[in-house]
């Protein structure tokens, strides 16, 4: 079974109305092939809307929550119209008295499931966002998928839990502020693809949302394990750095399943094979 994936590398800029933001989204999505099974947008792609509130400090970025209903309505409409699954990046939303960085997955009928980012990057602390406590594998579209938002790709346990619970593709919307930050997430994303024998789709926010918010830096990619079934470097598709653009690639699920059985490096099953040895060391005991 072959799955076509499109990553929309979104270039944020200051916008003063939701209509301007919507035009940016539609500019990219109209370039997406009609037969793509999954479309992904990056983390906090709505952050340029913070300019609508005038000069402010970084902590006031949470005010973009005021656009939550319009944001959801837009992507619900697009998923229904296009009959495609859309991972609509992430957006800051208020739930009771707390704000969460939430990834929304819209099925082709407009229904939605969500994932609250579980590990907040240290620099995000200034935005006063809270952390989610759940990891879930979603049966949305033709395969089972998981979400690892940016910094979550740097926490190996996240992708391991998702993969052992059935996720074959992990989607990673991200927003990194520096070249080093981009490569940190990218290298970790590829490590997760190799060690769990999954496909990993990394989709970063790029552009300039305006002071005091940091610029986005990155290059979208569709990543595979490094083995004979795929390009030697494990890159199925890759975008131009820091451009407002899309990439599309096709991944073969049968090749992935066969690779787990008989690939050169069968890391998915071999990690379980020695779990008795790992248990001796109780890695989380003594952590403070």
What are these regions (language model features)?
Residues 94-165, 178-191, 265:
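Active-site catalytic loop in hydrolytic enzyme cores
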Residues 1-7:
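Extreme N-terminal starter segment of soluble prokaryotic enzymes
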Residues 137, 206-288:
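C-terminal beta-strand edge segments of enzyme domains
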Residues 9-15:
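Short polar catalytic/cofactor-binding loops
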Residues 37-38, 145, 169:
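Structural motif
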Residues 19-108, 177-191, 195:
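Cys-nucleophile CN-hydrolase/nitrilase-fold catalytic domain and related Cys-dependent amidase chemistry
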Residues 67-85, 154-243:
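CN hydrolase (nitrilase-like) catalytic-core segments centered on the catalytic cysteine
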């Amino acid at each position: 079974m072959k799955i076509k994936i499109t990553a929309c590398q979104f270039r944020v800029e200051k916008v003063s109305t939701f209509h301007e933001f919507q035009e940016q989204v539609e500019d990219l999505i109209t370039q997406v092939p009609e037969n793509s099974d999954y479309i992904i947008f990056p983390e906090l792609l709505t952050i340029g809307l913070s300019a609508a509130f005038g000069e402010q400090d970084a902590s006031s970025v949470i005010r973009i929550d005021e656009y939550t209903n319009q944001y959801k309505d837009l992507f619900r409409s697009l998923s229904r119209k296009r009959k495609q699954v859309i991972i609509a990046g992430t957006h800051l939303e208020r739930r009771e008295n707390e704000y969460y960085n939430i990834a929304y997955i819209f099925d082709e009928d407009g229904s939605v499931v969500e994932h609250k980012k579980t590990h907040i990057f240290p620099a995000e602390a200034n935005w006063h966002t809270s952390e989610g406590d759940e990891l879930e594998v979603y049966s949305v579209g033709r395969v089972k998928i998981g979400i690892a938002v940016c910094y979550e790709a740097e926490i190996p346990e996240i992708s391991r839990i998702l993969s052992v619970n059935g996720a074959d593709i992990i989607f990673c919307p991200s927003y990194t502020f520096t070249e080093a930050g981009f490569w940190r997430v990218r290298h970790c994303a590829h490590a997760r693809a190799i060690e769990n024998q999954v496909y990993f789709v990394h989709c970063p926010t790029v552009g300039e949302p305006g002071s005091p918010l940091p610029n986005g830096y990155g290059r979208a990619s569709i990543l595979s394990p490094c083995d004979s079934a795929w390009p030697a470097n494990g890159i199925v598709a890759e975008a131009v750095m820091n451009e407002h653009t899309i990439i599309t690639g096709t991944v073969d699920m049968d090749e992935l399943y066969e690779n787990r059985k008989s690939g050169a490096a069968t890391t998915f099953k071999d990690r379980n094979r020695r779990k008795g040895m790992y248990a001796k060391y109780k890695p989380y005991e003594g952590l403070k």
